[in-house]
């Protein structure tokens, strides 16, 4: 694609990037081993310091410098598994990811390093540290505690109390004397205090059957047990995601079986080897979603939906069960009732009951709307079945949802998505999007010609702040699908924008990876409007990565509370529903004409279409996630089916196992999928309070947004960012109105 109009000339190499993408499989393996050795040396040096020797420079700054180097190199080695066209390189990258994940666990469990960090905290008492350095030190201590490294003191206390009791000194004699033994109650009290640390249930334990040292041995071995679990978890998460990325399942259909799909879609499909004029349809997004929205053959949609929600069913179902059980074990060892409780401690929500109340309250508000929408869909289905002489089963099936939701847009809002996409060719959308972001955030983007990347389709841009002349970083755009590539849309932070040890700033680097329809000889890549929305969303994450100006790598970019991380990019989705921005990124791919005003107005009104069902499905996914991480024995498929019926009112297809395809469960969103809805409360408040009131293209508001929300990264709490940008505590009103709901009291989040 061409650079946006008015772009500055390209420079040959990006400033500050430490990344390279020409590594072969053996080079990746070798570099991973070297990175581990180099980083371990730093940790060994810190761990060997005497108490009197620890200082900000040789402890805090040394660890920060090692973390920065490790983060950049690790990203360079494990990112290729998601994007490399070479299976060998992807495999080596996955191996490196597993090796480095194991090392991550090792470093997180360094008792010696944790001890030096706590010594430093006691020594400095925060007085001599800058605010972000103090936050970094406190976070290191907190992460150590969340790995159980603080338990050594409890271990010593338990040992002292157990050894002091007569019961512990002579268990065989004590058993014959029953409850009359002096010290027995003290020993039992000690046991009850530490029991949650190793996850034992209630009741009278056979604490002493193995001898005096048994209980103390269990407690002292906790860090090692936690370490083992964390290593297993990291490998399982990698395997879960890899299985989905590498899945190459396809179905073969005749043109008749694909009835209703446009010619440009059909002509883009490969022919199936089995012959008979059949076409290959994969389970990747660019094939799955268009088919589910437009194919009027129910049996075709049914086959696709069944296979899509059965991807990697056997292997990922086993992995998922292990994940939830191991997470529960680890959290119990650390004294948490559930894994969800462990995770939420670091989020805005803080507690499971807060999340449950939020989801229940929103579901109750949305259910009446969902019932109305289901009635409309059922009516559309009955009418179509009569017109096409198809049997009407009187129900909405999972494979009916997207098809009839699309029909709602077409019939009730007169929005023809096939016609609309002709106005969204990739080149025009990209130029418009980049122009809008530049104007809004006060930035300039320059495309780098002949830049090194992992595939010829990938393009690189440099981002500068014209006000200061500073280069903030670079971003890659990898927008089209290919075999073995990450199957969804996501932003990958590759190099943190933060301070180097010498005080200079390392520029940030990020990649947006997506799977939009590839161009053909007959037509360019044409985007559905929801794909334009996805583009805006993920690019919002890119801007978060590049605009943050944290001092430490740990706080760079999107390293904020997980239930706030989506808010900045969700807020920017609003621009694809506003008239002026839409006109800037939409022109007919043949005539160059803008979207007709009438069609544009219909599109904007259609934002309310299906909002009840869409958000109820989000609640289903969030509740499944919460259920699995609060009740690890729950069956994922059964839990999903139950919630689909109870919350959404649409049954899951028997035999499928959607949770086995739910990448978020292994991708860092465990017990946190609720965050998509939770974040939207804040994103809508930010948009309607500032941009809608002062101008959606206001450079002043855009700069405030960049400085208050994007610039801090995770160096301050999200609550503080929101207060600074909004000028008041956030409210839920804009969120409820955006869903077509009445504004009123409820259990939606209040950050302050």
Q: Where does each model-flagged region fall?
A:
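Active-site-proximal, well-structured secondary-structure segments within enzyme catalytic domains
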Residues: 132, 136, 202-203, 209, ...
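Active-site recognition of the HExxH zinc-binding catalytic motif
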Residues: 527-546, 569, 680
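Divalent metal-coordination and catalytic microenvironments
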Residues: 28, 152, 219, 335, ...
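Catalytic Zn2+-binding segment of zinc metalloproteases
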Residues: 336-337, 540-552
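C-terminal substrate/ligand-recognition segments
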Residues: 536, 613-631, 651, 655, ...
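C-terminal amphipathic alpha-helical interaction region
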Residues: 695-752
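A conserved hydrophobic secondary-structure block that centers on an alpha-helix together
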Residues: 148-159, 215-226, 310-322, 329, ...
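N-terminal helix-rich structural modules
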Residues: 1-178, 183, 187-191, 202-203, ...
